[in-house]
């Protein structure tokens, strides 16, 4: 919940206060497409072991840690620049935050599914939503209030430090059992090309990227297209319209503290009530 607002509303408020045009701010919303299209690299996160980290932490936690390192580094990169003189640096950092955050979402969802039985999934989802929303309060209302008094560079630095809570959680959380290999005949393919490096690479890509989509389409047939369209477009309006709301609040003369209190405290607690 913390990184996503540094890609959307909190970022847009910072840019508008620094005099960046609404047109330029709108282009920053494209960074949020990482959340919509994260399904494209989720099979790699599911199947690809990270060197060294995979042995130390396991598949799920190693990817979570890598994503958090990317996010922390990107937040610190953004804090080192200002929109007036380093807009490209902030744009690059925003893309990195979005990619790292989306990857963290993939790995966290996989960890949650693997670590607990089905009867505990609803409880874990509720806990996940609570943590997600508290992160949004920190990156929304908290960041805006801090920026009101100490500037956005200070606020971003504090938020990067808060990400260390998640890093500590990675080391404290249990690692689920190794994910089971996908079926669908991929084991036979991998066995047939064993010893051929090019064939092994092609078989691995098939089992990691192609096979999950084939299994999904075979299982749901033409409904799969509707499901993928819904998943891809479900939050699209929020990403675009929500991103442009804060610049309008700033133009209307509201202070950052007022925007944070109304938009990112009262609204978030209403969402938390719904999660219960």
Predicted stretch roles:
Residues 34-41, 262-276:
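Transmembrane alpha-helices of Major Facilitator/SLC transporters
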Residues 1-35, 223-248, 252-255, 260:
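Helix-loop boundary and gating motifs at the non-cytosolic
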Residues 178-226:
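Juxtamembrane intracellular "pre-TM" segments in multi-pass secondary transporters
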Residues 35-39, 122-147:
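Glycine-rich segments within core transmembrane alpha-helices of 12-TM secondary carriers
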Residues 46-49, 53, 78-80, 137-157, ...:
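Transmembrane alpha-helix termini and helix-breaking/packing motifs in multi-pass membrane transporters
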Residues 50-51, 62-84:
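C-terminal ends and interior cores of transmembrane alpha-helices
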Residues 56-64, 85, 145-162:
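A membrane-interface helix-boundary motif in multi-pass transporters
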Residues 65-72, 154-172:
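Symmetry-related core transmembrane helices of the 12-TM Major Facilitator Superfamily/SLC fold
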């Amino acid at each position: 919940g913390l990184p996503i607002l540094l890609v959307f509303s909190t970022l847009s408020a910072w840019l508008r206060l620094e005099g960046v045009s609404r047109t330029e701010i709108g282009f920053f919303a494209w960074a949020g497409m990482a959340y919509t299209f994260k399904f494209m690299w989720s099979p790699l996160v599911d199947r690809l072991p990270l060197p060294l980290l995979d042995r130390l932490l396991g598949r799920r936690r190693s990817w979570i840690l890598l994503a958090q390192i990317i996010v922390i580094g990107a937040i610190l990169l953004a804090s080192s620049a200002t929109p007036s003189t380093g807009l490209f640096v902030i744009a690059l950092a925003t893309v990195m935050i979005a990619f790292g955050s989306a990857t963290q979402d993939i790995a966290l969802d996989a960890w949650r599914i693997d670590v607990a039985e089905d009867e505990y999934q609803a409880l874990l989802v509720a806990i996940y939503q609570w943590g997600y929303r508290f992160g949004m309060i920190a990156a929304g209302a908290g960041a805006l209030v801090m920026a009101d008094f100490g500037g956005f560079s200070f606020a971003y630095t504090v938020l990067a430090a808060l990400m260390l809570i998640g890093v500590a959680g990675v080391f404290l959380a249990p690692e689920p059992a190794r994910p089971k290999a996908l079926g669908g005949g991929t084991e036979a393919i991998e066995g047939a090309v064993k010893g051929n490096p090019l064939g092994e690479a092609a078989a691995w890509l098939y089992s990691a990227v192609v096979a999950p989509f084939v299994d999904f389409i075979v299982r749901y047939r033409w409904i799969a297209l509707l499901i993928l369209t819904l998943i891809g477009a479900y939050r699209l309006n929020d990403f675009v319209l929500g991103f442009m709301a804060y610049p309008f609040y700033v133009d209307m003369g509201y202070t950052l503290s007022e925007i944070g209190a109304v938009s990112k405290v009262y609204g978030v607690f209403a969402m938390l009530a719904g999660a219960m």
